[in-house]
Amino acid sequence: DNRVGIVRDDQVLDVTAQADPGTCIPSLPVRLDLERCARRPLASVRLLSPVRAPGKIVAAPVNYRAHIEEMHKSNVSPGHNIPDIDRAGLFLKATSSLVGPAEGIAQRFLDRRTDYEVELVVVFGKSASEVSRDEALDYVAGYCVGLDITVRGTEDRSFRKSIDTYSVLGPWLTTADEIPDPDRLQLTLHQNGELRQNTNTSDLLFGVRR
């Protein structure tokens, strides 16, 4: 029922009654009276997207060095190779594609290859424009794990990545103060118990500060 909670160990503190949509995310635990919040076991709640309605979703294509090498070796590309991410630029995903980890993925275009990648998602807490790298992290509210789903084909990248449910975000938002260096995070993805992806954000071409 779209409630707001703060995760503490294996419990979720329900702060819906106190949460102000305009409140800066990183200061929520400080401003709220957590002692009088109702508590529920984390295992009993259904986790939706921790970001309800983002203004936009901006992504960088083929942003890991190892991924570029893999694509060249397997000759997998959306109709063309990406030799240089600086020339490829960033792209947008539809916000309507966003779901939480408990909502599931509705696969489309079953006659095509569909790929998936684990991603580090950076959530901005305030507007930013022409910010220096030294100040970049001051604008970050927190981080999430993302699952980016892609249908392979020759259409525009944004179209193939913007299908409903193809942007999974969660399991929750970790505030920026808990991650001092986002460029040293290990990301893994398992499918049915099998390790399918193992990478580190130190391998990013476009790092968080960039």
PLM regions and their residue ranges:
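Catalytic-pocket segment enriched in acidic/His residues
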Residues: C37-P41, R46-P50, N63, H67, ...
